[in-house]
Amino acid sequence: MCIRDRKYPELKEALEDLPIKVWAGSDAIAQVVQAKPIDMVLTAMVGYAGLKPTIAAIKAGKAIALANKETLVVAGELITALAAEYKVPILPVDSEHSAIFQCLNGAYDNPVEKLLLTASGGPFRQKTMEELALVKKEQALKHPNWHMGAKITIDSASMMNKGFEVIEAKWLFGVQPSQIEVVVHPQ
């Protein structure tokens, strides 16, 4: 069990008579993912927080189910090199990348020429550059299609998320950015 630092002493005391290990601190998740009975680790933390646990899991020989694109955005070269060194598969969980992965599964003798990623264009796709300069945070937080957390909503509205997905695809599928095309379509 992992817990925030401030509650650690209280929980540890409450569970001291039970066969439950309690971790706390910034290294807690990295310690947990190395546990013996675990064979696959789902990394679904937002942002840079997923990097350290992912590295620890790879070095412990655990398969990675990746739902944290930022890990590959900030350290794709390192993560893919470690995965190759430790013979650990990286399995994309995110919808588009998972679909591409499934399509490519078993197509070893058929090299990828191009990957297509789709984007709605966000709520501001019809705006001019001048209009975009006047957009307020509150407008960006009102996504027309779905409700998500603030960071992903801003990243989606600004198309930053799609940029992250291009970088993620580069590392997941071993292709060059020139082989990745983003098709913008409102639906």
Predicted features and spans:
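General beta-strand structural signal in soluble alpha/beta enzymes
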Residues: V22-G25, L42-T43, L66-A67, I90-D94, ...
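Short, small-residue-biased leader/transition segments that mark boundaries at the very start
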Residues: M1-I3
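Rossmann-fold NAD(P)-binding glycine/threonine-rich loop
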Residues: L11, Y48-A60, K69-V88
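Beta-loop-alpha module in the N-terminal Rossmann-like domain of NAD(P)-dependent dehydrogenases
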Residues: A24-A56
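Conserved anion/nucleotide-ligand pocket segment
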Residues: H97-N161
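Short gly/pro/ser/thr-enriched loop/turn and capping motifs at secondary-structure boundaries
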Residues: Y8-P9, I29-A30, T71-V74, H97-A99, ...
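Substrate-binding/catalytic subdomain of NAD(P)-dependent oxidoreductase enzymes
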Residues: T153-Q187
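Internal alpha/beta domain cores that form substrate/cofactor-binding pockets in large enzymes
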Residues: K7-A24, K36-D39
